[in-house]
Amino acid sequence: MISTTIFPGRYIQGYEATKRLGKEAARFGDTAFLIVDPFVNEQLLPRFQAEVEAEVKIVIEPFNSECSDEEIERLAVQVKEADAKVVVGIGGGKALDTAKGTAHALGLPVIIVPTIASTDAPTSALSVVYTPEGVFKRYLVLPKNPDVVLVDSRIVAEAPVRFLLAGIGDALSTWFEADACERSYAGNMTGDVGSMTARRLAGFCYETILEYGLVAKASCEANVVTPALERVIEANTLLSGLGFESGGLAACHASHNGLTALEDTH
């Protein structure tokens, strides 16, 4: 059997890491197109916008709530008109998936900046596409992972704790799905079987959350960045991302996809 493991090009995490965004974007060209959640545009971007603009020209466009084919097409037109050299997604999971899909449509590099640690989507070569009404439509499997994933732990610590807890719940399933795939010889997102590395990372993700999750929750409730919170952010984002993508998916994700058809789950 052949196993395949895939990774993002670069993972950066730490307190006020968003101040590094401009330097990372400049590695790809002189103009960056920022796809942002409306909250990010109003409340968070002013914190680090000056540092970004010191390195590259930026074009900012708010994201319209759903990662749909229609939204990706709309944004791709604007990115092309701006002659941007890199797409940057800043916000929650759907905004980030939209940025990945938009960059893929144009063959551009993409930088992913999650503002919450609620999912393991940021590191993956995958966008989950919904209808404009928010019903799961399909997985868009991309040819490569994001070029850069940049996580500002200060921003994550200031977000409502329910987002961190959602990420913990998501990440806890990673080990069980990877284990189920190993036992059944099921393929991962590449179609090959998962590697030993992916399974170990999925297990380490589970262990990290059990050891540090409670303290990380308290840290987030107090809006304070602590070593425990940093570890859980990394587990929710990087370890879970590598674990699900290269370890494989099972019943947990299938259940989620079906639940999106129920209006009360949105």
Model-derived features with residue positions:
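Electropositive phosphate-/nucleotide-binding environments in soluble metabolic enzymes
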Residues: Y11-K19, E42, P46, D69, ...
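A short, small-residue-rich loop immediately preceding and capping a beta-strand
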Residues: V79-T102, L106-T115
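ATP/NTP phosphate-donor binding region
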Residues: M1-V86
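Active-site segments that bind and position negatively charged phosphate/pyrophosphate groups
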Residues: M189-H266
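Short glycine/serine/threonine-rich phosphate/pyrophosphate-binding segments
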Residues: T18, N41-L45, D69, K94-G101, ...
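A glycine/threonine-rich phosphate-anchoring loop and its flanking beta-alpha core
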Residues: G9, H104-T197
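Alpha-helical scaffold segments in soluble metabolic enzymes
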Residues: R20-E24, R47, R74, G101, ...
